[in-house]
A protein has these predicted regions:
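C-terminal cap/substrate-recognition subdomain and adjoining C-terminal extension
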Residues: 44, 48-132
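Alpha-helical substrate-recognition element adjacent to the catalytic core
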Residues: 1-67
Length: 132
């Protein structure tokens, strides 16, 4: 049984381009899985360093966008999900709506703007408050 309250699925830049300490603090009650970018292993190493972690989970790559979304949805399991991607299909949006407050979808290319980081912080704060 996991003690995590949520899972974060995102590209490396969301974490490597965040302010110092933001990702580590935000992930205190969660876990991360990276969707690799064009930099591949180098960007995954950068995430591990940014998190001061010895290992980082990676979401399995798929042949097409629809299959990739299904993999992320399966990875979410019963936990709340923060999912950052450049866009979402109608199927992914419908899935997120069915999960209601358990899912936060954020459309962003590369790093996360400050206003979106605040949305993530509020979401995590709500989850932490419910778990207390």
């Amino acid at each position: 049984m996991t003690s995590s309250l949520f899972r974060l699925v995102c590209g490396p830049a969301v974490l490597t381009n965040a302010p110092a300490g933001w990702a580590t603090e935000m992930l205190r009650d969660g876990e991360v899985a990276i969707v690799p970018d064009a930099e591949g292993l180098a960007s995954i190493h950068a995430v591990a360093r940014a998190l001061d972690a010895t290992a980082v989970a990676v979401v399995r790559g798929e042949d097409d966008a629809a299959a990739q979304e299904r993999t992320v949805m399966a990875h979410a399991g019963p936990l709340a999900l923060i999912w950052v991607a450049s866009g979402f299909s109608d199927d992914a949006r419908a899935w997120a709506q069915k999960r209601a407050p358990m899912t936060l979808l954020i459309e962003a290319d590369g790093d996360l703007p400050q206003d979106e980081r605040r949305r993530v912080e509020r979401f995590v704060s709500i989850l932490s408050g419910q778990a207390a």
